């Protein structure tokens, strides 16, 4: 054992133990195209084996922000990895991508093999849900940079789409229908405000049980994993019914829906056309947040918004229903008369 490194606060043996523990989790993410296993200097993937004619690679990277601090407070680390995968694969799925492979990066103050196994197990769970292989990663023990009980998590996703099937919103037109896919909760954005409103202002803890939340512990509600939409979207992409997709993350409806809409057009959203999850009512009251501002911060119960030609609305809704995916008609595309590209009615 390298004593000098150990004396500096880095445990090489603990690093070996983490690799040993996570191998079985990585193995269950294997998918066609993967070449070899973990342990090399890079992850290998054979794109040609998938049979794409004009493949375009689509990549994304993200983390889970201060949701990690809620995981720490609740001492629950087995789902935060799902969030990390979801944030990345949902972004690339919004462009029509089939996720291929994923890499993670974990930085920590002290290498705790049992805890890090929980984190990576969650990453593997997310990869399985997304049909993405976990082909590599990095665990960096950084004493002095982080406290011993702190860690950070980031992910990197690469997917592929046929060049002709990339979803970029360019064909969105006035009259198109907006369909929303429900979220599972707060997902992984806005947690600095979540913590301030619930823990500082309202005085709640992760163990607080609220009637508004069905008596469930607040920490469990907040740590509900971000929904992965890959399997919900795949049949729609194959049918060619989707013109644009907005992943509702940081910035909520107000900032994310306009990202898919061409200049001169706007999304007109009819409030009340979908059920807003109770956690958002709790947040609004606890933080004394203006109701309209909530839509500029949180997903408000909708994690993905799809733009669909009205002639294919029923087809899209049937494809979702056949896949047991709930969906709501939220509104439509209109001319932009406000310069904001979005109107909440």
Curated annotation (Swiss-Prot):
GO MF assignments: ATP binding; phosphoribosylamine-glycine ligase activity; phosphoribosylformylglycinamidine cyclo-ligase activity
Annotated protein name in UniProt: Phosphoribosylformylglycinamidine cyclo-ligase
Keyword ATP-binding: yes
UniProt catalytic activity: 2-formamido-N(1)-(5-O-phospho-beta-D-ribosyl)acetamidine + ATP = 5-amino-1-(5-phospho-beta-D-ribosyl)imidazole + ADP + phosphate + H(+)
Gene: purM
Origin species: Bifidobacterium longum (strain NCC 2705)
GO annotation terms (biological process): 'de novo' IMP biosynthetic process; adenine biosynthetic process
Protein keywords: ATP-binding, Cytoplasm, Ligase, Nucleotide-binding, Purine biosynthesis
GO cellular component: cytosol
Pfam families on file: AIRS, AIRS_C
Pathway given in the UniProt record: Purine metabolism; IMP biosynthesis via de novo pathway; 5-amino-1-(5-phospho-D-ribosyl)imidazole from N(2)-formyl-N(1)-(5-phospho-D-ribosyl)glycinamide: step 2/2
